[in-house]
């Protein structure tokens, strides 16, 4: 049986490739957007920011998605 309440928090993962492209191409052309994933994590087990390698349809490749503050 579960002990107490669940302390998992919602986490947003943002594509680091899209963010870098948006900063570098600010004047040249507008990017399609920034892709984000929603997931959960237990802050007691993983206090450091979460980074996962996921697919980004805007970059059309697998990139590192890092945790952002909401």
From Swiss-Prot:
GO terms for molecular function: structural constituent of ribosome. The keyword Plastid applies. One of its GO terms (cellular component) is ribonucleoprotein complex. Signal peptide: none annotated. It holds the Pfam family Ribosomal_L33. SUPFAM superfamilies: Zn-binding ribosomal proteins (SSF57829). It comes from the Eukaryota. GO terms for biological process: translation. It is found in: Plastid, Chloroplast. Keywords: Chloroplast, Plastid, Ribonucleoprotein, Ribosomal protein. PANTHER family: 50S RIBOSOMAL PROTEIN L33, CHLOROPLASTIC, LARGE RIBOSOMAL SUBUNIT PROTEIN BL33C. Belongs to the bacterial ribosomal protein bL33 family. This is Large ribosomal subunit protein bL33c. The lineage of its organism: Eukaryota, Viridiplantae, Streptophyta, Embryophyta, Tracheophyta. The gene is rpl33.
